[in-house]
């Protein structure tokens, strides 16, 4: 039979620390040294074991050799560049395309200043940041999917 350590929630010192939201993990134990000395090495070792195991058991396959004289009809970037590629492809002016790409990180930098009056860390209590995250994710997915289609149906994804 295992013994589980449960925090004494009647302790006023522990209640004060938990009310502030720092210094203890979910079980009420101190974060130092328990998390840094016991949990983190296990996570790091597990991550290395997974990476090495995948590299040994499933090595990357080599593709066909490159032919510099036969280029594909449409060159696409890697999948994580699809939204940026779609912005550059659909905006008619190159300067406007670059400004539209620069507006994304500038907009993300303004979120902490908008939400600075809100002291909650719970995402349900930070509606502006949560809505911006959800809208930004949907727009990025929409642009990423649209980048795989030809230019004439890329914005509407062929829906209308």
Swiss-Prot record:
It comes from the Eukaryota. It holds the Pfam family Cytochrom_B_C. GO terms for cellular component: chloroplast thylakoid membrane. The chain crosses the membrane at residues 36-56, 95-115, 131-151. One of its GO terms (molecular function) is electron transporter, transferring electrons within cytochrome b6/f complex of photosystem II activity. HAMAP family: Cytb6_f_subIV. Belongs to the cytochrome b family. PetD subfamily. This is Cytochrome b6-f complex subunit 4. It comes from Chlamydomonas moewusii (Chlamydomonas eugametos). The gene is petD.
């Amino acid at each position: 039979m295992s013994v589980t350590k449960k925090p004494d929630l009647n302790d006023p010192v522990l209640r004060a620390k938990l009310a502030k939201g720092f210094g203890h993990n979910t079980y009420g134990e101190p974060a130092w040294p328990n998390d840094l000395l016991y949990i983190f090495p296990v996570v790091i070792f597990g991550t290395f074991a997974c990476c090495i195991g995948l590299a040994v058991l499933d090595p990357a396959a080599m593709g066909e050799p490159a032919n510099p004289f036969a280029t594909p009809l449409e060159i696409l970037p890697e999948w994580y560049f699809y939204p940026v590629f779609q912005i550059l492809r659909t905006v008619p002016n190159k300067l406007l395309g670059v400004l539209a790409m620069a507006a994304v990180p500038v907009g993300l930098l303004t979120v902490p200043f908008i939400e600075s009056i809100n002291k909650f860390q719970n995402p349900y209590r930070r509606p502006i940041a949560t809505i911006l995250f959800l809208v930004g994710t949907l727009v990025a997915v929409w642009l990423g999917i649209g980048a795989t289609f030809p230019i004439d149906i890329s914005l509407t994804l062929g829906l209308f």
